[in-house]
Amino acid sequence: MKLKKKFLEKSKKIAEERIDVLMNLAEKESKAGKIDRSKNYVLLGKKIAMRMRMPYPKEWKRRICKNCGSFLIYGKNARVRTKAKNYPHVVITCLECNSITRIPIKSEKK
């Protein structure tokens, strides 16, 4: 059992590194204007995470459109706004498919 656990930990670490490399490549290609290639890198990263049954890293998860799968670069193909109507939140709008993602802002406790 110990051997299997060590193998799983090692393979998950390798998967995290690969996802990180793929997302960095997706960001680079997105900035260069090659959107199809960046979508491909995002899809590969998601497949690796699903195969290893691990959650997608939060810092990358928020940079991907849930509807069309494109890598979001704020100001280029995504719009970011803060709203405080009912509850304070950040609204990220994908400018390719017009889907909206809302992320709540937690208020500081005094």
Curated annotation (Swiss-Prot):
Cofactor: Zn(2+)
Enzyme class: hydrolase
Pfam families with a match to the protein in the record: Rpr2
GO-annotated biological processes: tRNA 5'-leader removal
Signal peptide: none
Cytoplasm among keywords: yes
E.C. code: 3.1.26.5
Its job: Part of ribonuclease P, a protein complex that generates mature tRNA molecules by cleaving their 5'-ends.
Similarity comment: Belongs to the eukaryotic/archaeal RNase P protein component 4 family.
Quaternary assembly: Consists of a catalytic RNA component and at least 4-5 protein subunits.
Record-given protein name: Ribonuclease P protein component 4
Organism: Methanococcus maripaludis (strain C5 / ATCC BAA-1333)
Gene name per UniProt: rnp4
